[in-house]
Amino acid sequence: MLVLSIRIKVWQTMESEITKRIVVPELEDILYKEHKVLDKGFVRLVDYMGSDESVVQAARISYGRGTKSVSQDAALINYLMRHSHTTPFEMCEIKFHIKLPIFVARQWVRHRTANVNEYSARYSVLDHEFYIPELDHVATQSEDNAQGRGNSLSNEDAQYVTDLLKRDSDMVYETYNKFLIKGVSREISRISLTLNYYTEWYWKIDLHNLLHFLRLRSDVHAQYEIRVYAETMLEIVKKWVPLTYAAFVEYCLESQSFSKSALSVVKKLIAGEDVAREDTGIGKREWRELMDVLADNK
């Protein structure tokens, strides 16, 4: 009983101490909470290091932290973001626990600037959980984008597709179970499963590279199934580093960059000149994108 009493006393002392690390109350409120994504997936914040304060502290290391106001911190972060000074943003890190379909994970790991540890089907048995898209997300192949969707299928055709997906997903899991019952190794049994089965991982990344990931994967041209994860994570970033998030939206997420030729077109249009695409050397796709931006049709 004496040992137990001492342990309780030590634990109570540890709980009563105030941490000296930077704490963001808005993130403390959502630590370990699941944010549902797709039909069975989720994003869960596991840990974080730093805040907006860490960014400005790193940027001001040459002359100390000083006594700066929030407006001055915001102005500095805006400057860093506008001029692509990335190192200060690398001082913050965040770790997520994510559950996602395997085909989404394969896109995700193309971003090689994170630390990843994935659930291993060599050591553990996978659950009978697979992704089935909602009917309005079952679409034709895009005619002008080799990677993208076109128009949605009719409800009847979409239902046909999802019914087949469910049938095949159930069938391959039954095969997977038969292999396991027969004593086939897990690392061989798993290869029968399809790409819509769910996996899980821990994913840790610094703020700069996270923002790069989110800029690409939250874009309207990104595949829907990865975009919804990015949108969920953006909301977490907004709580974590609100000044950095505001600068990111202003200078990256909702801004536009132009090629030299496109900028020349913009200048001529501002000057009231008529401009034909054929006279600019700009390709059809870039021209269409430029006109969409100028017409605010995106």
Curated annotation (Swiss-Prot):
Pathway(s) of this molecule: Pyrimidine metabolism; dTTP biosynthesis
Keyword Transferase: yes
Limits of the ThyX domain: 41-251
Domain of life: Bacteria
Gene3D superfamilies attached to this UniProt entry: 3.30.1360.170
GO molecular function: flavin adenine dinucleotide binding; NADPH binding; thymidylate synthase (FAD) activity; thymidylate synthase activity
Annotated positions binding FAD: 87, 110-112, 118, 206-208, 212
InterPro entries linked: Thymidylate_synthase_ThyX, Thymidylate_synthase_ThyX_sf
Motif ThyX motif, residue range(s) on this chain: 110-120
Protein task: Catalyzes the reductive methylation of 2'-deoxyuridine-5'-monophosphate (dUMP) to 2'-deoxythymidine-5'-monophosphate (dTMP) while utilizing 5,10-methylenetetrahydrofolate (mTHF) as the methyl donor, and NADPH and FADH(2) as the reductant.
Family statement: Belongs to the thymidylate synthase ThyX family.
Summary of subunit composition and partner proteins: Homotetramer.
Name of the protein this chain belongs to: Flavin-dependent thymidylate synthase
Organism: Ehrlichia ruminantium (strain Welgevonden)
Species lineage: Bacteria, Pseudomonadati, Pseudomonadota, Alphaproteobacteria, Rickettsiales
